[in-house]
Swiss-Prot record:
Gene: murC
Family statement: Belongs to the MurCDEF family.
Keyword Nucleotide-binding: yes
NCBIfam families: murC
Gene3D superfamilies: Mur ligase, C-terminal domain (3.90.190.20), Mur-like, catalytic domain (3.40.1190.10), NAD(P)-binding Rossmann-like Domain (3.40.50.720)
Protein name in the entry: UDP-N-acetylmuramate--L-alanine ligase
């Protein structure tokens, strides 16, 4: 894939294939807000396409060559298959074809970019920074990978000089970016369908970091600590070299409080509506960015206090019969552990409902998934969400469930959506926290479960 950059062309009509995706829709919306002509296509309507259509973007449902009439540039993501009819038609017809990351990198050239990367925590950290800057009056332009209520969605065009953007490492395209500030939250083995090994992942992050003016990273991650050219650092593990640390930490069911220190000197008290240790680390990254930009700690703390969390990041969907339903995007073993640790703070019995994401990830991290659910009282596993992959590895949701069951006493596998709903309707009980985990479409059944009027039946 050619990842070179080219200048934005006046009068260009950009067509986004898969425009309803969270990353594609945000970029399309910003371009439209800049006055550029944008269209797109997707398989079916969703919240994103409805918002795009309301903004004046033409959205076609179904991928067809005729959708490209008048288009001068086609934008695609790594989720689009090579045989997509619009992609093929664009290449045959001489239409410029650009990866989403190329277009975002071009957009970034006009801003002081704050790029947030890392295996975990990108969306929450970038959203924290964006909300902080917004509440401090800096009016940033934002493109993030989740819905943020305080910003009105997953993207916005601001009038200020800053662009806050989530930088995706999954396909190697992070090397296109040269941000003013690069935040690296952590680096772990993931996306090994693209990278041969962890070393290749680290090298991609190194190239990205070397292209930044300032690199903010977490010393609690060995790969970040040992391999990133850090300018500013933060830590919750008490690393003496860290620029930003926290003590007097309190985790409750309502949120997190901590005292923040800058190079050993007390800055003040931080209060978050977010749960869990991992989110305090994300907030420290935001503090570091805010201080680099010249904000006072009082401004930073006030801005971060406003953030209620991105959608699908420990998002409370609803409650029925004293059963709380929470949706979370966690799809890597480390994310599962962190999210379950936060769930335990609620003081409820935790029932983890897990949809593995991608055959490749499930196979490569099978043993790690096996030990990731220790903080759940009960676990229900579904079939794997393919995300466009073919299953050539012989892995299945049932295999994942068996691996978890080797380390956990209460694990069930449900192969279909209907059997999963029947199981949950029969076994959830008052006082439970039903935690839906995964980056696929598992959360679609939550509204159906919330609509049940009858109280749940037998306990597990």
């Amino acid at each position: 894939m050619n990842m070179s950059l080219d200048p934005l062309v006046t009068g260009e009509v950009s067509h986004f294939v898969g425009i309803g995706g969270i990353g594609m829709s945000g970029l399309a919306l910003v371009l439209r807000s800049q006055g550029k002509r944008v269209s797109g296509s997707d398989l079916k309507p969703n919240l994103q396409t409805q918002r795009l259509e309301a903004s004046g973007i033409s959205v076609f449902y179904g991928h067809r060559a005729e959708n490209l009439q008048g288009v001068t540039r086609l934008v695609y993501s790594s989720a689009i298959q090579p045989d997509n009819p619009e992609l093929l038609a664009a290449r045959r017809g001489g239409v410029a074809v650009r990866h989403r990351a190329q277009v975002l990198a071009q957009l970034a050239e006009g801003y002081r970019m704050i790029g947030v990367s890392g295996t975990h925590g990108k969306t929450t950290t970038s959203s924290l920074i964006a909300v902080m800057l917004y509440h401090c009056g800096l009016d940033p332009t934002v493109v993030v990978g989740g819905e943020v209520d305080e910003l009105g969605g997953n993207a916005r065009l601001g009038s200020g000089p800053h662009l806050v953007a989530e930088v995706d490492e999954s396909d190697g395209s992070l090397v296109l970016f040269s941000p003013e500030v690069a935040v690296v939250t952590n680096i772990e083995g993931d996306h090994l369908d693209h990278y041969a090994n962890l070393e290749q992942i680290v090298e991609a992050f190194q190239q990205y970091a070397n292209q930044a003016r300032v690199v903010v990273g977490c010393l609690d991650c060995q790969a970040v600590r040992d391999r990133m050219p850090l300018t500013v650092s933060y830590s919750l593990d008490g690393h003496p070299q860290a620029d930003y640390t926290a003590d007097r930490v309190s985790f409750t069911a309502q949120g997190t409080t901590a005292r923040v220190l800058e190079r050993g000197e007390v800055l003040g008290e931080l209060s978050l509506k977010l749960l869990g240790r991992h989110n305090l680390a994300n907030a420290l990254a935001a503090v570091a960015v805010g201080r680099y930009l010249g904000l006072s700690f009082e401004q930073i703390a006030a801005g971060l206090r406003e953030f209620r969390g991105a959608h699908r990041r420990f998002e409370r969907i609803g409650e029925r019969d004293d059963i709380v339903f929470v949706d979370d995007y966690a799809h890597h073993p480390s994310e599962v552990r962190a999210t379950l640790a936060a769930a335990r703070l609620q003081g409820r019995r935790v029932v983890a409902v897990f949809q593995p994401h991608r055959y490749s990830r499930s196979q490569l991290l099978l043993d790690e998934f096996g030990t990731a659910f220790g903080d759940a009282d009960a676990v229900v596993v579904t079939e794997i969400y393919a995300a466009g992959e073919a299953n050539t590895l012989g892995v299945s949701g049932e295999l994942v469930a068996r691996r978890i069951a080797a380390h956990h006493p209460d694990v069930h596998f449900e192969a279909t959506s209907d059997s999963l709903k029947r199981h949950l309707e029969a076994h959830l009980r008052p006082g439970d926290l039903a935690l839906f985990l995964g980056a696929g479409n598992l959360n679609r059944i939550i509204p159906e479960l919330l609509q049940r009027a009858e109280p749940p039946a037998l306990a597990l």
